[in-house]
Each structure stands twice: as C-alpha cells, then as structure tokens.
C-alpha cells in the first residue's frame, strides 16, 4: 500500500476528533467530582452485560489496565463511595464490582451529558466517515478539524 497525503490527513482528523471528545469527557468527569478513570470504571460496571457485575479482570480489560492497576482504581473508587466489591454467587473466589447509589447517579448524569454531546458530534463524525470512505479531504477537514459549537 502506497501512502498518500490524504491518508495522513484522514488519520490526523480522526485522532484530533477523538482527542477533542476525550478531552471534553475528562473535563466533564472532573466537573462531576470524579476522575476520568473513575468515570470509565463506572461505565465499565454499568455497561457490563452480566447483571452480576464485572470482575476485576473484566474491568482491567475494558480500561486496558494491568490487573493490579485495576485493583488500585477500584480501591480508590470504593473509598470515594462510588463502587462496592462483593463475591460472585457461583464462585466465592471471584470478586464482582457494583455501583453504589452515588456512583450510579454520577454515571447517569455524565451519560446524559455525553449522549447529548455525541448527538451534536454525530453530523461531523458521519462526514468524517464518509470522507474516509470516499477520500474526500476537504469535507474531512471541515468535519473534524473545526471545533464543535459548545451548546449552553
């Protein structure tokens, strides 16, 4: 595959858009009184498909952390009153993570804000994907490199 300038422009636009969203998301988490990592943890717990809750290994996988780093994050979140640990009902040696009421409320508030922001970003992201598929560099620059309006 021979790379051309637009390949780099597309990759830059995609990474810039992702970084801007992540930066915004981190700011939202801090404004809610939690760290960005705690926000990701809360989302990993509530978004986990098993109603029993994720294991520490599941959390490590979702957050791309080593097991001991996930343990530390869970410890800090538990100390902050965001999550609890409990044994798995089928296997007492397995630890499951659950949200507290406080953790659930913070995540619900952040998720509402994030979904609203994603609705605003959706048109630009659709344009970006179309540009990536069609190699439309001008559309790509307009869609991804122009800051999104800040509602409110």
Regions found by a protein language model. Give the residues of each.
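N-terminal helix-turn-helix DNA-binding core of bacterial DNA-binding proteins
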Residues: 23-66
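Histidine kinase transmitter module recognition
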Residues: 17, 21, 48, 62, ...
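Short, structured helix-loop boundary elements
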Residues: 7, 11, 35, 56, ...
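Short, hydrophobic-biased segments on the C-terminal half of alpha helices
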Residues: 56, 74-75
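Pre-recognition alpha-helix immediately N-terminal to the DNA-recognition helix
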Residues: 13, 20, 40-44, 105
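Charged, amphipathic alpha-helical coiled-coil/dimerization segments
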Residues: 75-133
């Amino acid at each position: 595959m021979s790379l051309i300038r637009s390949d780099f422009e597309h990759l830059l636009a995609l990474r810039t858009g992702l970084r801007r969203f992540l930066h915004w998301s981190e700011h939202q988490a801090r404004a809610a009184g939690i760290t960005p990592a705690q926000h990701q943890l809360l989302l990993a717990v509530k978004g986990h498909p098993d109603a029993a809750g994720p294991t520490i290994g599941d959390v490590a996988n979702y957050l791309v952390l080593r097991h001991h780093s996930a343990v530390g994050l869970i410890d800090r979140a538990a100390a902050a009153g965001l999550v609890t640990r409990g044994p798995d009902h089928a296997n007492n040696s397995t630890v499951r993570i659950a949200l507290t009421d406080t953790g659930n409320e913070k995540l619900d508030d952040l998720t509402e804000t994030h979904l609203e922001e994603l609705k605003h970003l959706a048109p630009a992201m659709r344009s970006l994907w179309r540009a990536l598929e069609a190699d439309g560099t001008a559309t790509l620059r307009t869609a991804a490199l122009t800051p999104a309006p800040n509602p409110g």
